Amino acid sequence: MTATSPRLKHEVKDLALAPLGRQRIEWAGREMPVLRQIRDRFAQEKPFAGLRLVACAHITTETAHLAIALKAGGADAVLIASNPLSTQDDVAASLVLDHEIPVFAQKGEDNATYNRHVQIALDHRPNIIIDDGSDVVATLVQERQHQIADLIGTTEETTTGIVRLRAMFKDGVLTFPAVNVNDADTKHFFDNRYGTGQSTLDGIIRATNILLAGKNVVVVGYGWCGKGTALRARGMGANVIVTEIDPIKAIEAVMDGFRVLPMAEAAPQGDIFITVTGNKHVVRGEHFDVMKDGAIVCNSGHFDLELDLKYLAANAKEIKEVRPFTEEYKLTNGKSVVVLGQGRLINLAAAEGHPSAVMDMSFANQALACEYLVKNKGKLAPGLHSIPVEVDQEIARLKLQAMGIYIDSLTPEQIEYINSWTSGT
């Protein structure tokens, strides 16, 4: 249902959900002291005054604090969902009603609605785009070349989105600066590892109420998200198997104490399969065919392409929902495969996404990346740019201070030593 308000355009499920969203946003804020400090500074300095901004992100309590910080900084912001199943409808309602931020997102929206919301966002003629998977940027490049002149730059938070941006740059169509937030140390070391690890298992447990102890859990991909997922699954008593295509990551998984197998060998052994690769069809027909009866598969990468769901649907006698966000595919071979969250991000489809404490740093990076683009307008070459090291370090310092933790600094003697080549044995 589209709600209407006399104050601003929006499409959310129900504005009556705003009180619950307000309460949950306030709770999340307790764990986000870094972003709060940035918001307070933005409110004084107004770095985005007069600028139009589009944020394509998962509409969660944590994202709400990013949007509020950007508005405090003077941004004329519009918010849309980066995934059809990740929107928290109460949060969307609160942002509209309590903060007067236009939101176009509803949990469970179909692909046509999702794509229409991308077009609505681009109708805002953004000067800055915060993207999560690069759908908005890709649409801009493919369909709205005339609007690129309005753009100062973009930021991207996901591995999947960075892969797309690199491909765009290689093809010569990334003609504006894009800040790679994903590779900031204060993002991927914590968000990708600790955030994904915890929230993925949270989503699986909420969807199934299954006991992980003693189960064979196959983690497909051993990047930072895979590392975190494997670590947490082992911590809950699972027997973890890792599959990889990168020999270096495979060695790392082995030395971290995990079994490493080709997917063809892991498929008949697994009870639960979790994909975290950002690539297409990493679990496909030949794997589904040999899985145990009742095997559970889910995705914690980005898009819903990691599992070949078209194959499953084509080879299913029956598909039925057995629990919320849990569908059983009864196959023609007599076995069944259980798919969680329609193959989309299980941590957001069935749970609430990453904990606020890690998103505090990720969204601090997003906020400061936007400020970096504004401060360097016209100075940055087209293509990908890293978060400045000093920004990364400052976010870490602020986080430590908020935790009541303080660290040492180099003495003058040590600084002199590490900058000299004359001292030796």
From Swiss-Prot:
Q: Does the keyword Ribonucleoprotein apply?
A: no
UniProt-annotated location(s) = Cytoplasm
Q: Which pathway does the database say it acts in? A: Amino-acid biosynthesis; L-homocysteine biosynthesis; L-homocysteine from S-adenosyl-L-homocysteine: step 1/1
The protein's UniProt keywords, in alphabetical order, are:
Cytoplasm, Hydrolase, NAD, One-carbon metabolism
Q: Which Pfam families match?
A: AdoHcyase (PF05221), AdoHcyase_NAD (PF00670)
Q: Which GO terms describe its biological process?
A: L-homocysteine biosynthetic process; one-carbon metabolic process; S-adenosylmethionine cycle
What cofactor requirement does the entry state? Answer: NAD(+)
- Which residues are NAD(+)-binding? 158-160, 192, 221-226, 244, 279, 300-302, 347
Q: Main subcellular localization, coarse class? A: cytoplasm
Which NCBIfam families would you find in this protein's record?
ahcY (TIGR00936), PRK05476.2-3 (NF004005)
Q: What is this protein called?
A: Adenosylhomocysteinase
Species annotation: Nostoc sp. (strain PCC 7120 / SAG 25.82 / UTEX 2576)
Lineage of the native species?
Bacteria, Bacillati, Cyanobacteriota, Cyanophyceae, Nostocales
Name of the gene = ahcY
